[in-house]
Amino acid sequence: MILTVDVGNTRIKAAVFEGSSVLEYFVFEKNELEKRIEKILEKFPNCSDLVVASVGDVEKQSFLSFEKQLNVHFFTHEDIFPFHNKYATPKTLGIDRMILAAGATLQFPKQNRLVIDAGTCITYDFIDENDNYLGGAISPGLRLRYETLHNYTARLPLLTLDQPHSYIGDSTAQAIHSGVVNGFVYEIDGFIDEYRSNFSNFIIILTGGDAEFLAKRLKNTIFANSNFLLESLSQTYQYKIDND
């Protein structure tokens, strides 16, 4: 069994895998890390490996405390990945983005793939049908857009995510919701349209904390999976074992 962990900017997601099957997903706060990992291991005592995407120094020490029980692996740029990294600055490419690209390469072979991760930031990562990682884009996520409007203006309120009533906002709150949510959706659809106009045999994978909210609002056909990173971690780790 493998325990995969995704340390996000706000929360931690985890999953236990046996082979290619997921047994259970978990979500918890960063300050609960060690306690919750201990609980997971009590429930799944046959876990042999702990695999982590990207992590800060504080969290890393917490994970290392489990080294006596598990094989602990932090993915780095030195690991083997199932794609050719054509990024102009490969060492600056986030490990989480590399894991997503690896998962897309392994799950959807011989296709052009665009992975969209809608979290604190939204990232776009493109892997062509020849398994070349070419790059993508980064822009603010939904929450960051709400916070930016509040923090960098004198009077605009800080709102939480909500579906706008219309694209024409008839109040300040509705105008903000329309600008943030509709603008976000138009951005994603615009990127997808641009890729579609240049590449055929194409699949779009949408993941991240806001994936479910966005999936039903996009005009393009997508494969939505909010746990794609955790699944990709398990698959990429198995790929590493098989190819080391």
From Swiss-Prot:
Catalyzes the phosphorylation of pantothenate (Pan), the first step in CoA biosynthesis. It comes from Flavobacterium johnsoniae (strain ATCC 17061 / DSM 2064 / JCM 8514 / BCRC 14874 / CCUG 350202 / NBRC 14942 / NCIMB 11054 / UW101) (Cytophaga johnsonae). Its cofactor is NH4(+); K(+). It is found in: Cytoplasm. ATP binds at residues 6-13, 120. Transmembrane segments: none annotated. Signal peptide: none annotated. Its EC number is 2.7.1.33. The active site is at 96 (proton acceptor). Keywords: ATP-binding, Coenzyme A biosynthesis, Cytoplasm, Kinase, Metal-binding, Nucleotide-binding, Potassium, Transferase. Homodimer. NCBIfam families: baf (TIGR00671), PRK13320.1-5 (NF009853). Its main location: cytoplasm. A monovalent cation. Ammonium or potassium. Pathway: Cofactor biosynthesis; coenzyme A biosynthesis; CoA from (R)-pantothenate: step 1/5. It catalyses: (R)-pantothenate + ATP = (R)-4'-phosphopantothenate + ADP + H(+). K(+) binds at residue 117. GO terms for biological process: coenzyme A biosynthetic process. GO terms for molecular function: ATP binding; metal ion binding; pantothenate kinase activity. InterPro entries: ATPase_NBD (IPR043129), Type_III_PanK (IPR004619). Coiled coil: none annotated. It holds the Pfam family Pan_kinase. One of its GO terms (cellular component) is cytoplasm. The gene is coaX. The keyword Amino-acid biosynthesis does not apply. This is Type III pantothenate kinase. CDD domains: ASKHA_NBD_PanK-III.
